[in-house]
Amino acid sequence: MSKRDFYEVLGVDKTADEKTLKSAYRKQAMKYHPDRNPGDAEAEAQFKVVGEAYSVLSDPNKRAAYDRMGHAAFEQGGGMGGGQGPFGGGGGAADFADIFEQVFGEAFNMGGGGGRRGGRGQAGPARGSDLRFDMEISLEDAFNGKDETIKVPTAMNCERCDGQGNEPGTELETCGTCQGAGRIRRSQGFFTMEQTCPQCGGRGQYVKTPCNDCDGVGRVRKTRTLNVTVPAGVEDGTRIRLAGEGEAGARGGPRGDLYIFISVREHEIFERDGPNLYCRTPASMVQAALGCTIQVPTIEGGKAEMKIAEGAQTGKRMRMRGKGMPRLRGGPRGDMIVELFVETPRNLCDRQKELLKEFCDLSGEGCNPDSAGFFNKVKQFWDEVTTDDGRPNAG
């Protein structure tokens, strides 16, 4: 007896993506589930065929083999190895239970980092998934702290059925295969093995009349609006945990958590290193030579006075204590380190040039000790590598 085409079994075309396959399997599995069709051998057989089709088409390798060779890929001598079958060896009810659990138990298990707790195949409540939200703020926001309103797409308990999955006014049905235990025992020779119930996926109950709003899942996708307080002192990469603000749990389980990941934008003036701030400030050649008091910007938005000593050079660093960032866990503020760079005058008029030349003529080595020392070293170097007549010294 020839087998039906797996794509035909699920009612999809050969270009169907993973989402389409899962939706089609879910629809067919609910339709032919044995607990919905008690005593119907034909429905039970079709339920297994649907599971077999999905197990092949949802696996990229098996699907590729099936597309090339059809059902022959899983028969004796086929491309998947002699006699393996689409389930890779074991086969049977446990594999259908795995598929059923994967599709129905994790229908809303998206994103975040938590996932469900308690393990597959266990009846009862399951914790919702954790969620991640990325928030970009300015350096000023990191200094002052801020309150932000965010919108987070998440799975929430269906209001119509209160997260139970069944249409209001109907009851969850006890699984007839495991009698509500969620697990069954099978004997193989001298051994007795316990496994997840293949009919209810380990829940012990099943939804006979699905809720019209959530289609029996118990959760729906919605966008939540939350108020988030970003504390002063947060750094780039800081993670803020909002307990219980993640995905809704399954079957009355607790919600997961929401994690806010902070990203601090680069600033035009300041660079940050932990609690300390760095900025570069210009000074004229005259200011640097004679010394002066200049005004430098602060992260608060104001200005602070800083004294420049006489003869300051480019690269000189000066520390302003307590003018940096607040610390997230308390304690004194960091410092602001100001780095000086001396500007060389440009676009000089003739008179300015004359004055600079006059200044240069009056300057002695004492005015430019670094330059004098450098040129003395150069002269000494040339004396060592050349002869008296200017030729390179062979020695």
From Swiss-Prot:
Keywords: Chaperone, Cytoplasm, DNA replication, Metal-binding, Repeat, Stress response, Zinc, Zinc-finger. CXXCXGXG motif repeats lie at residues 158-165, 175-182, 197-204, 211-218. Participates actively in the response to hyperosmotic and heat shock by preventing the aggregation of stress-denatured proteins and by disaggregating proteins, also in an autonomous, DnaK-independent fashion. Unfolded proteins bind initially to DnaJ; upon interaction with the DnaJ-bound protein, DnaK hydrolyzes its bound ATP, resulting in the formation of a stable complex. GrpE releases ADP from DnaK; ATP binding to DnaK triggers the release of the substrate protein, thus completing the reaction cycle. Zn(2+) 1 binds at C158, C161, C211, C214. Pfam families: DnaJ, DnaJ_C, DnaJ_CXXCXGXG. The keyword rRNA-binding does not apply. The keyword Chaperone applies. The lineage of its organism: Bacteria, Pseudomonadati, Pseudomonadota, Alphaproteobacteria, Maricaulales. This is Chaperone protein DnaJ. It is found in: Cytoplasm. It comes from Maricaulis maris (strain MCS10) (Caulobacter maris).
